[in-house]
């Protein structure tokens, strides 16, 4: 069964173009289930599944242990361990995806997860920040330094286009057309889309790309955003920089790069952009995903109304 886990992870990586973050989560979730099955089947613990390991140890974990009862017991055990509902939901989702892969490749004849459902999650609306907070964040990088210029450019691009952090780090030189102010994005599942950027974002990009210090450190001739060693920035390093600027700006709350994506989507909607256009710009596969911003916009309107009304 462990070889099937690895085949599934290879499929996610090579065919479905899953991000390293997604692959890490799948490894964590499948390892958790594997440990449970080994314990449930009274088998000796084996090496954890690691997609990036050169050694892939096969074990005697039989598919006969992968039953509906086993999956139910596993979910029950997670609940008894007081795991968060979102964690339980994600782990069940990983097992279901693995099961569907096995059915598709005729490794399994029946789906052990078919009638099993995870816990219901409360609908959480994304919390955008205000125009004023966006301006405060933008003004934080030190523009006297090359790295500050790069980081201002990053922030401007996040807000200009609502890009995911993984889409920002994967940007290459040939993805940007300065004549039309358009950029080509490789989104989830290798789906490409072409979206506009603001004139201001284009100006910051040109200034950053033409900076002599950037040319001096560049080792990666393709990547747009480089670290101080001249290689492509990672999602983790951008996350760290983002948190640094939050501290320096004095802004409080749970604000992440993804918050900026939620923010510009909400601002687009408030300024009259239709949902289909927002869906295309954000790269949502379903309009239902985009519709959540109508609820966010209404929530903000109600909040503003209550705060501004004399009887509020």
Curated annotation (Swiss-Prot):
Q: Which residues are named in the active-site annotation? A: 164, 188, 258, 261, 284, 293
The record ties this protein, via InterPro entries, to:
CB, DNA_brk_join_enz, Integrase-like_cat_sf, Integrase_catalytic, Integrase_recombinase_N, Integrase_SAM-like_N, Tyrosine_recombinase_XerC/XerD, Tyrosine_recombinase_XerCD
Top-rank lineage group of the source organism: Bacteria
Keyword annotations: Cell cycle, Cell division, Chromosome partition, Cytoplasm, DNA integration, DNA recombination, DNA-binding
Q: Which Pfam families match?
A: Phage_int_SAM_1, Phage_integrase
**CDD domains reported in the protein's UniProt record:** INT_XerDC_C
Provide one Gene Ontology biological process annotation.
chromosome segregation
Q: Tell me, what does this protein do in biology?
A: Site-specific tyrosine recombinase, which acts by catalyzing the cutting and rejoining of the recombining DNA molecules. The XerC-XerD complex is essential to convert dimers of the bacterial chromosome into monomers to permit their segregation at cell division. It also contributes to the segregational stability of plasmids.
**What's this protein's family per the entry?**
Belongs to the 'phage' integrase family. XerC subfamily.
Q: What protein does this entry describe?
A: Tyrosine recombinase XerC
């Amino acid at each position: 069964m462990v070889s099937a886990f690895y085949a599934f992870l290879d499929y996610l990586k090579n065919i479905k173009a899953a991000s390293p973050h997604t692959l890490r989560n799948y490894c964590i979730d499948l390892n958790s289930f594997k440990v449970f099955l080994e314990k449930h089947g009274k088998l000796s613990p084996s090496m954890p599944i690691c997609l990036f390991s050169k050694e892939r140890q096969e074990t005697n974990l039989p598919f006969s242990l992968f039953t509906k009862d086993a999956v139910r017991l596993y979910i029950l055990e997670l609940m008894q361990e007081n795991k968060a509902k979102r964690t339980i939901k994600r782990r069940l989702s990983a097992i279901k995806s693995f099961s569907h892969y096995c059915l598709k490749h005729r490794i399994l004849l029946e789906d052990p997860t078919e009638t099993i459902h995870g816990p219901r999650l409360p609908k959480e609306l994304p919390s955008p920040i205000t125009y004023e907070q966006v301006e405060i964040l933008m003004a934080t990088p030190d523009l006297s330094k090359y790295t500050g210029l790069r980081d201002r450019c990053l922030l401007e691009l996040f807000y200009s286009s609502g890009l995911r952090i993984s889409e920002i780090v994967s940007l290459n030189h040939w993805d940007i057309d300065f004549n039309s102010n358009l950029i080509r994005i490789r989104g989830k599942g290798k789906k490409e889309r072409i979206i506009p950027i603001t004139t201001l974002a284009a100006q910051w990009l040109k200034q950053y790309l033409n900076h002599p210090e950037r040319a001096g450190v560049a080792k990666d001739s393709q990547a747009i955003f480089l670290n101080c060693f001249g290689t492509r920035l990672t999602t983790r390093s951008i996350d760290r920089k983002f948190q640094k600027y939050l501290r320096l700006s004095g802004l409080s709350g749970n604000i992440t790069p993804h918050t900026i994506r939620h923010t510009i989507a909400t601002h687009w909607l408030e300024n009259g952009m239709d949902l289909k256009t927002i869906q295309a710009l954000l790269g949502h596969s379903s309009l239902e995903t985009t519709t959540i911003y109508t609820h966010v916009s209404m929530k903000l309107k109600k909040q503003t109304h209550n705060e501004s009304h004399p009887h509020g």
